[in-house]
């Protein structure tokens, strides 16, 4: 987006700091799994948020990012988020929206936090960040996480190459300009890291690019549970026989998707978790699994329209890769690194804050080249 839409404040930020060619999301390239990977240094298959929605066998519950009670329930979250690590070592933290920051358990939350509300204006968030930075030293957070949902919304609704997305990127660029001006006005030595949880892949809304859930599996079968994530469909079976028969049916009609049994998941996904489906239907890039029937889709869908999606395997689809830019007193100006997986952001932040690392998937050496003492 920065190069495509010529975003001046982002370009200045990059020129004054370090950058990666790309930030590779962890599988699946979805919002909740990757936000939580960024702050835990663990892949989704290890931290437990395996998708934006999933079924949890142990508790016989379904987690969904739109279900407040589940989002705030620490049961679903493993790992040690950066704010929890900070708290364990007497360092204050704050968050203006981040996945995992709203848990009911105070010991696992930032010292200052907000419940997610997508209507809060960017200016309001920036003003709060600056007021946190202006707190007296004993109360001041040394770690702040901040989330902006634009241009993600526009990318989804109009596709990554649309005028609407361009306008949203330029609005985000203005927000970055204001944020950096305000941070500089505090005269504090602040390191700023800009990341995205994923990129965006353009699809065309057509019956030909749609996989209909009810044509893939028997949704009336009580011995099968499923959770559809659009790019992936998780299928949970009551027993091994049911799994094998379901798999055979899916394998026979395999077209525009790949079907995997759990033990067949590519090793690079590191996706062996109780909460992933016994069977996973992985839509091929450009295709999308929908819950509606073909009939309803053809009646209501904006056929031919461009949309943006993510969730595909980042190894196979470079478009779903994200950004990593950083600047500040602990960042080498002008440093460039090749594409790297987002599990490696956590150890850099921990090093800047001088916090010891818990057991994680990320490795400190990946970004040590951009670190300045």
Feature names for model-found ranges:
Residues 16-20, 88-94, 138-144, 187-191, ...:
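Loop/turn elements at helix/coil->beta-strand transitions in domains of secreted/extracellular proteins
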Residues 122-134, 151-192, 349:
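A long, amphipathic alpha-helix that forms part
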Residues 189-190, 198-238:
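Acidic/histidine-rich catalytic neighborhood
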Residues 41-159, 255:
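His/Asp/Glu-rich, glycine-adjacent segments
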Residues 1-18:
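Active-site-proximal N-terminal segment of extracellular/periplasmic enzymes that hydrolyze or transfer
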Residues 226-336, 340-348:
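Active-site neighborhoods of enzymes that stabilize oxyanions during catalysis
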């Amino acid at each position: 987006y920065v190069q495509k839409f010529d975003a001046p404040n982002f370009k200045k930020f990059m020129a004054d700091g370090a950058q990666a060619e790309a930030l590779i999301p962890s599988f699946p390239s979805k919002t909740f799994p990757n936000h939580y990977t960024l702050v835990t240094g663990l892949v989704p298959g290890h931290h437990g948020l395996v998708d934006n929605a999933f079924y949890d066998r142990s508790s016989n519950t379904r987690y969904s990012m739109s279900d407040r009670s589940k989002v705030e329930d620490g049961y679903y979250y493993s790992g040690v988020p950066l704010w929890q690590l900070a708290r364990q070592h007497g360092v204050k933290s704050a968050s203006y929206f981040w996945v995992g920051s709203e848990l009911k358990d105070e010991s696992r939350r930032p010292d200052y936090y907000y419940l997610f509300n997508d209507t809060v204006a960017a200016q309001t968030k920036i003003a709060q960040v600056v007021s946190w930075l202006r707190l007296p030293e004993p109360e001041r957070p040394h770690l702040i996480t901040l989330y902006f949902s634009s241009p993600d919304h526009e990318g989804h609704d109009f596709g990554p190459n649309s005028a609407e997305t361009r306008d949203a990127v330029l609005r985000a660029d203005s927000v970055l300009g204001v944020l950096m001006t305000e941070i500089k006005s505090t005269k504090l030595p602040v390191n700023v890291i800009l990341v995205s949880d994923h990129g965006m892949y353009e699809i065309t809304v057509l019956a030909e690019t749609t996989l209909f859930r009810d044509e893939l599996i028997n949704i009336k079968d009580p011995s099968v549970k499923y959770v559809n994530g659009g790019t992936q469909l998780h299928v949970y079976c009551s027993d091994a026989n049911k799994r094998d028969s379901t798999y055979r049916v899916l394998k026979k009609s395999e077209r525009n998707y790949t079907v995997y049994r759990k033990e067949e998941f590519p090793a690079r996904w590191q996706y062996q978790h109780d909460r992933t489906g016994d069977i996973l239907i992985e839509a091929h890039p450009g295709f999308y699994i929908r819950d509606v029937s073909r009939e309803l889709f053809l009646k209501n869908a904006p056929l031919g329209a461009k949309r943006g999606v993510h969730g595909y395997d980042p190894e196979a689809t470079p478009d779903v890769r994200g950004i990593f830019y950083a600047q500040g007193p602990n960042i080498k100006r002008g440093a460039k690194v090749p594409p790297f997986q987002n599990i490696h952001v956590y150890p850099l932040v921990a090093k800047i804050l001088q916090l010891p690392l818990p057991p994680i998937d990320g490795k400190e050496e990946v970004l040590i080249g951009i670190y300045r003492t």
